[in-house]
UniProtKB/Swiss-Prot annotation:
Stretches with biased composition (Basic and acidic residues): 44-55
Function, in words: Required for normal accumulation and movement of lipid-modified hedgehog (hh) morphogen. May act by stabilizing the interaction between heparan sulfate proteoglycans (HSPGs) and hh, HSPGs being required for diffusion of hh morphogen. Not involved in wingless (wg) morphogen movement, suggesting that it may provide HSPG specificity for Hh.
Biological process annotations from GO: positive regulation of smoothened signaling pathway; protein localization to extracellular region; protein stabilization; synaptic target recognition
Gene that this polypeptide is encoded by: shf
Annotated organism of origin: Drosophila melanogaster (Fruit fly)
UniProt protein name: Protein shifted
Tissue specificity statement from the Swiss-Prot or TrEMBL entry: At the blastoderm stage, it is ubiquitously expressed. As embryogenesis continues, it is expressed in the epidermis and central nervous system, this expression being segmentally modulated. Also highly expressed at the foregut and hindgut throughout embryogenesis. In third instar wing imaginal disks, it is highly expressed in the most anterior and posterior parts of the disk and weakly expressed at the antero/posterior (A/P) compartment border. In the leg disks and the antenna part of the eye-antennal imaginal disk it is also weakly expressed at the A/P compartment border.
PROSITE patterns xref list: EGF_1, EGF_2, EGF_3, WIF
Feature: compositional bias, Basic residues: 77-87
Length: 456
């Protein structure tokens, strides 16, 4: 064999050796991957079994997940791979609720908590009820149910003894929402404890029905008889059930309140009894012009006044910014403020670009503007075609226009044809007083009251 033939043979042997080595390395990698896969499966089984044990201790937050896995765990079967993945997400959420390590289920439980059923007294109503006890009113919510849990806020005996609904207030506003689940209500008790002073409470809604999912208001009206003066207690009972007729835990709710009523009649004075006359005269002097003295020698205040001797005027809404209530619903504002509630300031120079005067010579600017008078825009390049600056170089464009500065497109022509009004949107009219209709072309008739004496 020649030297050239030997060289070719050596090259072929070298190539065969390289191929064989690569095949061996590939087999080793396959075995290692198979070994790792087995270890992962074992770990996954262990995790799924532990998540099943942890899942057994959870309650309503993971009801759907428990129903799906009960048939597998209860019969001793190992969950399938797809269900093991479900357990790792859902079961981990259960443990996450306790230790903060889990994922999906725990966050779902939190979302359910945030969207649970709630019932509370309207903040504006609570300000009015507590205005006599707190100078600025009590502005926090007072819950009867908060996130599906019945609270004791409205059932507190201290509140019952402390809070008396004044004679000027004839209703109590409540706000409620059911959230994601369906709940049904039934007012099974609307009762007065003294029918001579207060009639039975009535509702602005049906006595029973479904609680709205979104936030809604309803009122409980408190009609005084008008025949007697005094303070009467009344009770409100409320049952709440799920769509499966299961009562909400903590219900029925029993709420007790007190309502003051004032008789507006005139009492007779026994002139034959000098002592009685003197006492009544003294009582009348104390009550002043804002009230009158009843047969029990107690001042009963006219509408809009309160206090032991009817010396305090009652303003609702409250006077703001340090204003004083000097007469029923009349606020005397301090220097620099104006408005029925002293809610607005007095600015020597007008606030520009939609700004609002909130204090003496101080403007509250709209979005996208700043300065003492809101005269400066945050848009370096002004918005065109009646666009409005709402942020740093950010314009809000009218319909039909677009672009960074509302420079692209054509403004839509308004189809609003108001004859006796002004356009408030693309196709809606706001009619002047005395007119109505889509285009404000209808005139309201004026009712003229004729005096019968004019015949003669």
């Amino acid at each position: 064999m020649t030297h050239q033939g030997i060289g070719c043979l050596v090259k072929w042997l070298y190539l065969v050796l390289i191929v064989h080595t690569l095949l061996c390395i590939g087999q080793l990698e396959c075995r290692q991957q198979h070994h790792n896969r087995n270890n992962n499966n074992n770990n996954r089984r262990a995790d799924s079994s532990s998540s099943e044990e942890g899942h057994g201790n959870t309650s309503d937050g993971l009801d759907n997940f428990a129903d799906q896995d009960a048939s597998f765990v209860g019969h001793g079967h190992q969950p399938r791979r797809g269900q093991r993945k479900k357990q790792q997400g859902g079961g981990g959420g259960g443990s996450g609720g306790g230790g903060g390590n889990g994922g999906g289920g725990g966050s779902r439980h939190n979302r359910n908590e945030e969207s649970g059923i709630s019932l509370w007294i309207n903040e504006q109503q609570l300000k009015m009820l507590t205005a006599l006890y707190f100078p600025q009113g009590y502005s926090e919510r007072l819950y009867a149910i908060h996130n599906s849990r019945v609270t004791n806020d409205l059932r507190d005996t201290t509140l019952y003894n402390f809070l008396v609904i004044p004679s000027e207030v004839n209703y109590v506003n409540f706000t409620w929402k059911s959230g994601r689940r369906k709940y049904f209500y039934d007012f099974d008790r609307l009762q007065t404890m003294d029918e001579s002073i207060l009639k039975a409470p009535t509702l602005s809604i049906r006595k029973s029905g479904r609680i709205p999912q979104e936030q809604k208001n309803f009122s409980i009206f408190l009609p005084c008889t008008g025949n007697s003066s005094g303070t009467a207690s009344f009770n409100v009972g409320l049952k709440i059930q799920t769509r499966h007729n299961k009562p909400l835990s903590g219900t029925p709710i029993r709420l007790n309140f007190k309502k003051e009523c004032a008789h507006r009649g005139v009492y007779d004075i026994d002139a034959s009894n000098p002592t009685s006359l003197t006492t009544l005269q003294e009582c009348s002097l104390k009550c002043g012009k804002n009230g009158y003295c009843n047969e029990h020698h107690i001042c009963k205040c006219n509408v809009g006044y309160t206090g032991q001797y009817c010396e305090t005027a009652f303003c609702f809404p409250q006077c703001l910014n340090g204003g004083n209530c000097t007469a029923p619903s009349v606020c005397t504002c301090p220097e620099g403020y104006q408005g029925t509630q002293c809610e607005g300031g007095i600015c020597k120079d007008k606030c520009l670009n939609g700004g609002k005067c909130i204090q003496k010579d101080k403007c509250q600017c709209s979005k996208g503007y700043y300065g003492l008078r809101c005269e400066y825009s945050k848009c370096v390049i002004p918005c065109k075609n009646e666009g409005r600056c709402i942020g740093n170089n950010l314009c809000r464009c009218p319909n039909g226009l677009r672009g960074d500065h509302c420079e692209i497109g054509r403004k839509q022509r308004s189809i609003c044809k108001c004859r006796n009004g002004t356009c408030v949107s693309h196709k809606h009219c706001k009619c002047h007083p005395g007119f109505y209709g889509r285009h404000c072309n209808g005139r309201k008739r004026r009712h003229v009251h004729r005096n019968d004496d004019s015949k003669f």
